[in-house]
Regions:
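Glycine- and acidic-residue-biased ligand/ion/polar-headgroup-sensing regions
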Residues: 53, 57-64, 83
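Cyclic nucleotide-binding regulatory module and flanking cytosolic helices
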Residues: 3-41, 90-91
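Cyclic-nucleotide recognition modules
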Residues: 76-121
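Short beta-strand segments in beta-sandwich/barrel cores
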Residues: 35, 44, 62-67, 85, ...
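A cytosolic small-molecule/anion-sensing beta-strand core signal
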Residues: 40, 59-60, 81, 106
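Short phosphate-coordinating micro-motif centered on Lys-Gly-acidic
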Residues: 45-50
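A short beta-strand-loop-beta hairpin characteristic of the jelly-roll/cupin
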Residues: 64-76
């Protein structure tokens, strides 16, 4: 079963809406230095518990972010659409295993940039 929840630890909304970030410049960085990854519908960009060190910029398609709880229930914790940034922000920043899975709900194109590259921004 899938459940909807408010995943407070996931703060990509804050990242996407940050007034301190020049998003046009940031998008340009992803398109110039990022690696294009094409995912088919139902392929995973990240699986829960995997290590991740990339942030994605979605140029086409839609991603669903889900988390499986200790009872085995799958919770929808967010979506990322075209022109959104997508990652498991808390695990990326804290350098821990992914707390969510990021799955393509349509065919998707996403430019992946390592956190180390973004830190130089």
């Amino acid at each position: 079963s899938l459940y909807l929840c408010n995943y407070k630890a996931f703060s990509m909304d804050k990242f996407n809406a940050s007034k301190n970030v020049d998003t046009a410049r940031l998008e340009k960085l992803f398109l110039e230095k990022g690696t294009l990854k094409v995912l088919k519908k139902n392929e995973y960009m990240v699986r829960q518990n995997d290590k991740t060190n990339h942030i994605g910029f979605v140029t086409s398609g839609t991603f669903r972010l889900t988390r499986i709880d200790t009872n085995g229930n799958e919770w929808i914790v967010g979506y990322s659409f075209e022109n959104d940034f997508v990652c498991d922000y808390p695990s990326l920043i804290n350098r821990t295993s992914a707390t969510v899975s990021i799955k393509a709900t349509t065919d998707c194109e996403v430019y992946l940039l390592p956190l180390s590259e973004l830190n130089q921004f």
